[in-house]
Amino acid sequence: MSLSLVSYRLRKNPWVNIFLPVLAIFLIYIIFFQRDQSLLGLNGQSISQHKWAHEKENTFYFPFTKKYKMPKYSYKKKSGWLFNDHVEDIIPEGHIAHYDLNKLHSTSEAAVNKEHILILTPMQTFHQQYWDNLLQLNYPRELIELGFITPRTATGDLALKKLENAIKKVQTDKKTQRFSKITILRQNSQSFDKLMEKERHALDVQKERRAAMALARNELLFSTIGPHTSWVLWLDADIIETPPSLIQDMTKHNKAILAANIYQRFYDEEKKQPSIRPYDFNNWQESDTGLEIASQMGDDEIIVEGYAEIATYRPLMAHFYDANGVPGEEMALDGVGGGCTLVKAEVHRDGAMFPNFPFYHLIETEGFAKMAKRLNYDVFGLPNYLVYHIEEENH
């Protein structure tokens, strides 16, 4: 059959005369005017259903790299395009969300009541032992959010790379193994990792170092705390061993602020056997000597605990550990460290933060404890409940 004959029959068929214009209009609409979704996509799905990795994993990264840069929001409606795979802007449904924080509670039965906990970690070095310990916590992961902040330095870049790899393995696993949400920040303020291990413990750099750390903690806290957060657990990146029931054990006390006792495992060369020793001396009770020293200081001076140059004679929780004692025994405190400290979210919401300036001659976590007490919150510690700090290698 010749082409001319086929063309003649098509022109004479009334259905063809109707179908071709309709098809042309439909194609023009799809290409130029269709707004909701494209007909093309991955795995047979529409492009509007396509998600970036951070959306598939329910993992939220702040835009520290182009790879994970979040789309900018615009109220202008974007026209669809046949080959456009742009992900729709991520905004709350309806643009406005209402939360009644009066219904948000922090109780002694946190897991039973499905209370959300936010675990926050400033991280200058990624330790696999820290991550492995985090994964062995048996609090429901759908109730756990993680927040990290890394410095903009070479060590911070390395820590970030290792952290991202570890996160991807978990957040692409079975849904039951994924954390509710993960946020990574790159520090905008002064970096907190300028010094090596021995240098960062020197007395003459404490004010600068602790101020930088306070800024990092505040950036991390205020960028991650959400309307569903009931508890905030400050867990240092150097903490590599805790009981699996850490969160349940600490929330059970139902305290506004509660600190675990930070110890360190090491090999005792004299006794030729493994042993433990106290590590964190920032969990303390105030003393008359400490108050007297503070009264004689200038406005910009701070007291730093654990140094012979400033003998405050404060009772340090690290020295109250009793191997035969009850793990749940409580001790009233006036200062806390940030190694493993649980805080009711309402304490932070009420304004207790980490001062990067001398606050009653205290700074960072110890200043936070003072601020919380000024807000009429009580501070406690668990002298017989041990968690372990990694043993430093760069002595």
Curated annotation (Swiss-Prot):
Q: Which cysteines are joined by disulfide bonds?
A: none
What spans does the record annotate as topological domain Lumenal, numbered to this chain?
Answer: 34-395
Q: Does the keyword ATP-binding apply?
A: no
**What parts of the sequence cross the membrane?**
18-33
Keyword field: Endoplasmic reticulum, Golgi apparatus, Membrane, Signal-anchor, Transmembrane, Transmembrane helix
Annotated InterPro entries: Mannan_Polymerase_Subunit (IPR052086), Nucleotide-diphossugar_trans (IPR029044)
Give the UniProt record's GO annotations in the biological process aspect.
cell wall mannoprotein biosynthetic process; protein N-linked glycosylation
Query: Which GO cellular component terms, listed alphabetically, does the Swiss-Prot or TrEMBL entry include?
Result: cis-Golgi network; endoplasmic reticulum; endoplasmic reticulum membrane; Golgi cis cisterna; mannan polymerase complex
Membrane-protein topology: Single-pass type II membrane protein
- Signal as a keyword of this entry, yes or no, is no
Protein localization: Endoplasmic reticulum membrane; Golgi apparatus membrane
The record's Gene3D superfamilies line, in alphabetical order, gives: Spore Coat Polysaccharide Biosynthesis Protein SpsA, Chain A (3.90.550.10)
Further information in the entry reads: Present with 1630 molecules/cell in log phase SD medium.
In the record, the note on similarity to other proteins reads:
Belongs to the ANP1/MMN9/VAN1 family.
User: What does this chain do?
Assistant: The M-Pol I and M-Pol II complexes possess alpha-1,6-mannosyltransferase activity and are probably involved in the elongation of the mannan backbone of N-linked glycans on cell wall and periplasmic proteins. May also provide alpha-1,2-mannosyltransferase activity to the M-Pol I complex.
Q: How does it assemble?
A: The M-Pol I complex contains MNN9 and VAN1. The M-Pol II complex is composed of ANP1, MNN9, MNN10, MNN11 and HOC1.
The molecule here is called: Mannan polymerase complexes subunit MNN9
Q: In which organism is this protein found?
A: Saccharomyces cerevisiae (strain ATCC 204508 / S288c) (Baker's yeast)
